[in-house]
Amino acid sequence: MRSLLLGTLCLLAVALAAEVKKPLEAAAPGTAEKLSSKATTLAERSTGLAFSLYQAMAKDQAVENILLSPLVVASSLGLVSLGGKATTASQAKAVLSAEKLRDEEVHTGLGELLRSLSNSTARNVTWKLGSRLYGPSSVSFADDFVRSSKQHYNCEHSKINFRDKRSALQSINEWASQTTDGKLPEVTKDVERTDGALLVNAMFFKPHWDEKFHHKMVDNRGFMVTRSYTVGVTMMHRTGLYNYYDDEKEKLQMVEMPLAHKLSSLIILMPHHVEPLERLEKLLTKEQLKAWMGKMQKKAVAISLPKGVVEVTHDLQKHLAGLGLTEAIDKNKADLSRMSGKKDLYLASVFHATAFEWDTEGNPFDQDIYGREELRSPKLFYADHPFIFLVRDNQSGSLLFIGRLVRPKGDKMRDEL
């Protein structure tokens, strides 16, 4: 079946090349502003946090798809540090491994990193991002905190009255929808703890490929959630030259796909066969990823990926607590008095909600590539079963996103032996 698919993809690539007009001049590679030493240090720390938090969430049996922006999580910790005192503040810095940095270094460094990496224009990606801190109607946010949190973290602030829970939830979800231009219509259906502060991050991210997928190389396929459960999905296909590595010992393959302007890349790691991702996740560390990437080589690869939007909401409260953020979430111990001027607030929930769109769009591709000999026998990267993916900034090495796709949207197709 896969050999037939490979042949079909190669024939389609050649046939479609004749149809494509000479491409427009591709956008010149973007120019990222040089990061300060503080921002570079915090980029490294946020990457370490990414793997720790991902591993903690991967062990949660209730979690299927994972979608995290380590940069945004780091900014949330910075916000807690900004609004906290004593152990409450120091724990937030410790989870970020930034204990030895002065408070001002943390806030200015994270603010710089957030502005640089979320600059959609420079990076030619679609990334709509909003952060809002909701406080109980009985609490007023301090002016200094409102000003500083807006300056460093672009965080908005609102009071919310949960006596009318339906109206409160509607308000949160409407804000998220407006922030993401309707791509994320719902953050949550319920809020369990309504007597504390709610930090809500709402995001929509859409990669624009350095070389787009042809819109006609799209069809309906099956995605094997497990060996016995398959859902129908739309798949998009293209053949091109990519950094690629096949680890035969660990039975996994990985591919790196540059995004437009080449300031960042999407990296996908996938087991050779359908299996739970637990084995691969145990291998995944910052050091191991670096080692794998060092072995990648430019090769012809026929890539097939699910097409569509993945929507995921995580309440990170308990997962951050597992990494050491215990005081801020404890009603009896939290000291967030820099937020409100009083010790009358704790962090009840940290909602991290993302819509991530896998689509064909990107820079025009050069049809002349399909006459090259090396594309006649490409490696096959057929993502029809669970995989891990990362969006990586090529300058700082910071991760814009880390996630896994276990169950895409789709109806059950059939049972397989």
From Swiss-Prot:
The record marks 376-377 as: Reactive bond homolog. SUPFAM superfamilies: Serpins. Pfam families: Serpin (PF00079). Induction: By heat shock and retinoic acid. The modification Phosphoserine is found at residue 140. The modification N6-acetyllysine is found at residues 206, 318. Keywords: Acetylation, Chaperone, Endoplasmic reticulum, Glycoprotein, Phosphoprotein, Signal, Stress response. Binds specifically to collagen. Could be involved as a chaperone in the biosynthetic pathway of collagen. Belongs to the serpin family. PANTHER family: SERINE PROTEASE INHIBITOR, SERPIN (PTHR11461), SERPIN H1 (PTHR11461:SF27). This is Serpin H1. It comes from Mus musculus.
